[in-house]
Amino acid sequence: MSKDSKMRATINQKLTEMGERERLKELLRAKLTECGWRDQLKALCKDVIKEKGLEHATVEDLVVEITPKGRVLVPDSVKRELLQRIRAFLAQHAT
């Protein structure tokens, strides 16, 4: 396991143990709904299903096609806020 992987695992473990991971997920859900991201993704999914046809569109097709677009559509302000919260948590709980 690389040094980066170990650090990520340690950070993830600390976030999970302290309950911060769930709080961050809830914040992310709320922010993405608030900015219309979820509605944009629903519309993209509907477009893919129309294009492929209901009988031929699979969940895997949707995941493959929508995931990269979904990541790009996350507003920078949401990414910054989440990163800021993670950094603040880590600074507060540094060992």
From Swiss-Prot:
Pull one GO CC term from this UniProt entry: nucleoplasm
- Give compartment(s): Nucleus, Nucleoplasm
Q: Does the keyword Transcription apply?
A: yes
Stored InterPro entries: TF_ENY2, TF_EnY2_sf
Tell me which UniProt keywords the record has, alphabetically.
Answer: Activator, Chromatin regulator, mRNA transport, Nucleus, Protein transport, Transcription, Transcription regulation, Translocation, Transport
Q: Give any GO molecular function from the UniProt entry.
A: transcription coactivator activity
Report the record's Gene Ontology biological process terms.
chromatin organization; mRNA export from nucleus; positive regulation of DNA-templated transcription; protein transport; transcription elongation by RNA polymerase II
Q: Tell me, how does this one assemble?
A: Component of the nuclear pore complex (NPC)-associated TREX-2 complex (transcription and export complex 2). Component of the SAGA transcription coactivator-HAT complex. Within the SAGA complex, participates in a subcomplex of SAGA called the DUB module (deubiquitination module).
Role, per record: Involved in mRNA export coupled transcription activation by association with both the TREX-2 and the SAGA complexes. The transcription regulatory histone acetylation (HAT) complex SAGA is a multiprotein complex that activates transcription by remodeling chromatin and mediating histone acetylation and deubiquitination. Within the SAGA complex, participates in a subcomplex that specifically deubiquitinates histones. The SAGA complex is recruited to specific gene promoters by activators, where it is required for transcription.
Q: Which family does it belong to?
A: Belongs to the ENY2 family.
Q: Report what the protein is called.
A: Transcription and mRNA export factor ENY2-1
Q: Write down the species.
A: Salmo salar
Phylogenetic classification of the source organism: Eukaryota, Metazoa, Chordata, Craniata, Vertebrata
Chain's gene name: eny2-1
